[in-house]
């Protein structure tokens, strides 16, 4: 019975992927054989596009491409409650793991004369290399580039690019390399 339920869940996820491909007229590119019974909440607007291949999702993940491009590499895993929000470009390399609650943004609300704009944004591309592990509740902000084979500890806020493989954690409100 469990195998039947899993099979039906995977079938439903593939139907959902097909629906997104049709509804968004080619702006969502996903292989129809989704590797998990879950498929994320998706929003594509203003010429945005989402591409993913053999990506495994857990529950309550969301991907928004509001004029931006989201490209998730083959074999990547997104745990529960991950959010990817793009106005420009977010690229995640192959075989990368995202822990629960990871948030990735390539834009911030623009602040004009001390007032936060609801409709204007400052954007910069984000890239994460292949074979990375992004720990639970990590936030990755605009303009960050992370090289391959990087581990980022839980709860870290990444505001600067990482160019050397290793393990990184936030310490005293600064991201510090620990090995």
Where are these regions (language model features)?
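Nucleic acid-binding interface residues in structured DNA/RNA-binding domains
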Residues: 169-171
């Amino acid at each position: 019975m469990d195998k039947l339920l899993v099979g039906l869940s995977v079938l439903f996820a593939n139907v959902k992927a097909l629906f997104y491909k049709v509804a968004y007229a080619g702006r969502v590119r996903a292989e129809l054989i989704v590797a998990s019974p879950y498929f994320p909440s998706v929003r594509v607007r203003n010429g945005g596009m989402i591409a993913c291949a053999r990506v495994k999702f857990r529950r309550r993940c969301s991907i928004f491409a509001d004029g931006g491009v989201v490209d998730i590499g083959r074999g990547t895993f997104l745990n529960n409650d991950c959010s990817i929000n793009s106005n420009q470009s977010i690229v995640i390399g192959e075989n990368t793991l995202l822990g629960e609650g990871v948030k990735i943004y390539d834009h911030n609300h623009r602040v004009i004369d001390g007032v936060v704009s609801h409709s204007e944004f400052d954007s910069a591309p984000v890239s994460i290399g292949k074979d990375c592990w992004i720990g639970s509740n990590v936030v990755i902000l605009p303009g960050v580039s992370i090289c391959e084979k990087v581990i980022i500890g839980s709860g870290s806020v990444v505001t600067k690019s990482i160019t050397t493989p290793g393990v990184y954690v936030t310490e005293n409100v600064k991201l510090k390399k620990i090995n």
